[in-house]
Amino acid sequence: MADLVDKPRSELSEIELARLEEYEFSAGPLSVLQQAVKNHDQVLINCRNNKKLLARVKAFDRHSNMVLENVKEMWTEKKRTASGKKGKAINKDRFISKMFLRGDGVVLVVRIPSA
């Protein structure tokens, strides 16, 4: 496998590319998503807009684009007081049954094993 990792992708055959992609999905950072899909585990996704998503991953690709189910979106809002100062932080959330998440907004993915 090490010989495929070091070789430029333009020099690999289609079979070698498929083997390399399978290896990267099972051993690299994308293995977190692969295990979550296989075991139907929930994941906690931290997004660039500072929102968190707690969801089950149905599908994903190498760009971290994801199809999610049973999504709980969580964020914090700070209400302004009458004088214009930031007030107390309020935690908010909402439920979304199905969602497509574009991968460029993903910062961190943590798998939460089933109990």
Curated annotation (Swiss-Prot):
Entry keyword annotation includes Heme: no
Protein's UniProt keywords contain Cytoplasm: yes
Domain of life: Eukaryota
UniProt keywords, alphabetically: Cytoplasm, mRNA processing, mRNA splicing, Nucleus, Ribonucleoprotein
Entry similarity comment: Belongs to the snRNP core protein family.
Subunit description: Belongs to the 40S cdc5-associated complex (or cwf complex), a spliceosome sub-complex reminiscent of a late-stage spliceosome composed of the U2, U5 and U6 snRNAs and at least brr2, cdc5, cwf2/prp3, cwf3/syf1, cwf4/syf3, cwf5/ecm2, spp42/cwf6, cwf7/spf27, cwf8, cwf9, cwf10, cwf11, cwf12, prp45/cwf13, cwf14, cwf15, cwf16, cwf17, cwf18, cwf19, cwf20, cwf21, cwf22, cwf23, cwf24, cwf25, cwf26, cyp7/cwf27, cwf28, cwf29/ist3, lea1, msl1, prp5/cwf1, prp10, prp12/sap130, prp17, prp22, sap61, sap62, sap114, sap145, slu7, smb1, smd1, smd3, smf1, smg1 and syf2.
Protein's UniProt name: Small nuclear ribonucleoprotein Sm D2
Gene Ontology molecular function: RNA binding
Localization per Swiss-Prot or TrEMBL: Nucleus; Cytoplasm, Cytosol
One GO process term, biological-process aspect: mRNA 5'-splice site recognition
GO cellular component: catalytic step 2 spliceosome; cytosol; nucleus; pICln-Sm protein complex; post-mRNA release spliceosomal complex; precatalytic spliceosome; Prp19 complex; spliceosomal complex
Function: Plays a role in pre-mRNA splicing as a core component of the spliceosomal U1, U2, U4 and U5 small nuclear ribonucleoproteins (snRNPs), the building blocks of the spliceosome.
Provenance organism: Schizosaccharomyces pombe (strain 972 / ATCC 24843) (Fission yeast)
One Pfam family from the record: LSM
Cross-referenced SUPFAM superfamilies: Sm-like ribonucleoproteins (SSF50182)
Domain Sm, residue spans: 30-115
Membrane-crossing segments per the record: none
